[in-house]
């Protein structure tokens, strides 16, 4: 009875190991704002002036992002395709025959132990004394292919203004639906003149860009094999 109980317990553990670990539903902390954000210095108020810096932009400039703290809309359109293919074929075939045309003036000999020429066992020059041959062939093929497509829109914040009109932007978005959370994180450099009149910029115009799109939840867990399957893949030598 004890053996049957132990066997049943081991079977249950093995079956449980093939399933992905369940994730407990717990509130996730919101995406933290960029750490490099620096609050711009406020100009001293001038009560005697009709206009101030905060309202001057509405009259003398457009609404495109150009200062620290401004918001710019980044349109993520990433299409990446890569393919590599290699074929190798190598073949070599060689045959070598070595014969003696004459031996001490004789062109033939009979099999006679007392006659050293007879050791050749026949006519001199007709039978090969040494024959070698070799043949080798190699066929190799390899192919890799990868394709990625990401399309999204995210609002990013200007965290730094660099010389030459470069804007360092960072942004993040968190979306949760039925305990499934999706994250989009973006950072990069963009020229202020590349920002369109509607305060948007394409992700292909970002330099040193980093775009991450990942998720956490039930669907993400189902994408991975169980812990026992991963353990066996690491330990199995074949």
Swiss-Prot record:
HAMAP family: FlgH. Assembles around the rod to form the L-ring and probably protects the motor/basal body from shearing forces during rotation. It comes from Nitratidesulfovibrio vulgaris (strain ATCC 29579 / DSM 644 / CCUG 34227 / NCIMB 8303 / VKM B-1760 / Hildenborough). A lipid is attached at residue 18 (N-palmitoyl cysteine). This is Flagellar L-ring protein. GO terms for cellular component: bacterial-type flagellum basal body, distal rod, L ring; cell outer membrane. The basal body constitutes a major portion of the flagellar organelle and consists of four rings (L,P,S, and M) mounted on a central rod. One of its GO terms (biological process) is bacterial-type flagellum-dependent cell motility. Belongs to the FlgH family.
């Amino acid at each position: 009875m004890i053996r049957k109980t132990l066997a049943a317990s081991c079977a249950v553990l093995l079956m449980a190991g093939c399933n992905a670990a369940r994730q407990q539903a717990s509130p996730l902390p919101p995406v933290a704002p960029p750490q490099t954000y620096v609050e711009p210095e406020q100009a001293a108020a001038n009560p005697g002036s009709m206009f101030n810096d905060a309202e001057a932009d509405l009259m003398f400039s457009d609404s495109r992002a150009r200062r620290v703290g401004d918001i710019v809309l980044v349109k993520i359109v990433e299409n990446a395709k890569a393919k590599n293919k290699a074929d190798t074929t190598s073949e070599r075939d060689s045959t070598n025959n070595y014969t003696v045309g004459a031996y001490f003036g004789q062109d033939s000999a009979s099999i006679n132990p007392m006659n050293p020429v007879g050791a050749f066992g026949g006519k001199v020059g007709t039978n090969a004394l040494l024959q070698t041959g070799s043949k080798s062939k190699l066929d190799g093929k390899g192919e890799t292919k990868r394709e990625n497509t990401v399309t999204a829109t995210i609002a990013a914040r200007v965290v730094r203004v660099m010389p030459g009109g470069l804007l360092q932007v960072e942004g993040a978005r968190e979306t949760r639906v039925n305990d499934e959370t999706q994250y989009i994180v973006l950072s990069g450099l963009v020229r202020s003149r590349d920002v369109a009149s509607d305060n948007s910029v394409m992700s292909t115009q970002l330099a040193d860009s980093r775009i991450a799109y990942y998720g956490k939840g039930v669907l993400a867990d189902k994408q991975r094999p169980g812990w026992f399957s991963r353990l066996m893949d690491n330990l199995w030598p074949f």
